[in-house]
């Protein structure tokens, strides 16, 4: 983190057994690490588990509707969202294309129902839970138009910029990364976009190339310094309850996948 000028990062527990380890890491990180945990809301005792996670200092949950087989606005998730609402916590909801490389490495089939991962399914859930911060990673991972539509409807819905955004190849109209940022800014403004790289485990580590590409895209959009600071730092700091910085840094609290073991 020091070498790359990263002030704060977010990691996630991809299995319940990892949560205590991450809780200990947060204690040792002197306030520079926040954590989310993957939660399957269909699992027995899921709401109680979320309550324990929040009490341990977790900032919220990471949800995979396509992987676990439910709609975000369905009854399976309602009780979990009610717990998040109590604390105004974060629900990072993976929508669109889903690729988990470790699962691919072990030959686990990609039997994901992408119809369940439509950002439009978040609208009713977000409306019913106005204190919960819903974040769609990767600009919707191919469901970009739907992400923009959902963001237009819901003021508590955010988007993150993480990964190489290779989903752009799936769009019927050619898009540059700068085009993606420009359209996202038109809907979400600079206050509801969160920078991220989706950096993962070593040996790859920190994705400096993604930071460079996204800085260039923001520059091409003509965004002013305050807007850049919102995206690269301030918005994540606000959602995570961190102390805001006033020096408009060029580096950020990053939305990361820390374990990469979903």
Question: What feature does the model see in each segment?
Answer:
Residues 33-38, 157-162, 248-249:
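Short hydrophobic/aromatic-enriched beta-strand-loop microsegments
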Residues 3-8, 30-32, 127-134:
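Short, surface-exposed connector motifs at secondary-structure boundaries
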Residues 7-8, 15-104, 111-113:
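Active-site gating/metal-coordination segments in enzymes
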Residues 11-20, 40-46, 68-73, 140-144, ...:
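Acidic-and-aromatic substrate-binding clefts and catalytic sites of carbohydrate-active enzymes
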Residues 10-13, 38, 135-137, 160, ...:
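Short beta-strand segments
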Residues 1, 53, 61, 84, ...:
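Conserved, mostly hydrophobic/aromatic
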Residues 60, 74-194:
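Catalytic pocket-lining loop regions of alpha/beta-barrel enzymes
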Residues 1-8, 183, 187-194, 203-262:
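Mid-to-C-terminal alpha-helical segments outside catalytic/metal-binding sites
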């Amino acid at each position: 983190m020091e070498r790359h000028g990263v002030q704060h990062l977010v990691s996630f527990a991809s299995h319940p057994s990892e949560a205590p380890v991450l809780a200990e890491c947060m204690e040792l990180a002197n306030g520079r690490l926040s954590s989310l945990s993957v939660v399957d809301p269909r699992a027995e005792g899921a709401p109680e588990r979320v309550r324990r996670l929040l009490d341990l200092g977790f900032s919220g949950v990471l949800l995979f509707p396509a992987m676990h087989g439910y709609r975000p606005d369905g009854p399976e998730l309602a009780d979990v969202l009610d717990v998040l609402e109590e604390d105004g916590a974060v629900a990072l909801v993976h929508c669109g294309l889903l690729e988990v490389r470790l699962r691919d490495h072990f030959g686990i089939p990609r039997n994901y129902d992408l119809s369940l991962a439509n950002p439009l399914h978040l609208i009713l859930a977000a409306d019913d839970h106005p204190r919960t911060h819903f974040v769609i990673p990767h600009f919707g991972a191919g469901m970009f138009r739907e992400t923009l539509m959902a963001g237009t409807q819901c003021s508590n819905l955010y988007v993150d910029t993480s990964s190489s955004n290779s989903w752009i190849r799936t769009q019927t109209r050619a898009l540059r990364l700068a085009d993606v940022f420009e359209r996202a800014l038109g809907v979400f403004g600079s206050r509801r976009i969160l920078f991220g790289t989706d950096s993962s485990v070593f040996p790859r580590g920190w994705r400096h190339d993604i930071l460079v590409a996204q800085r260039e895209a923001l520059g091409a959009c003509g965004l002013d310094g305050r807007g850049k600071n919102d995206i690269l730092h301030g918005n994540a700091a606000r959602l995570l309850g961190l102390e805001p910085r006033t020096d408009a840094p060029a580096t950020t609290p990053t939305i990361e996948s820390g374990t990469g073991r979903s």
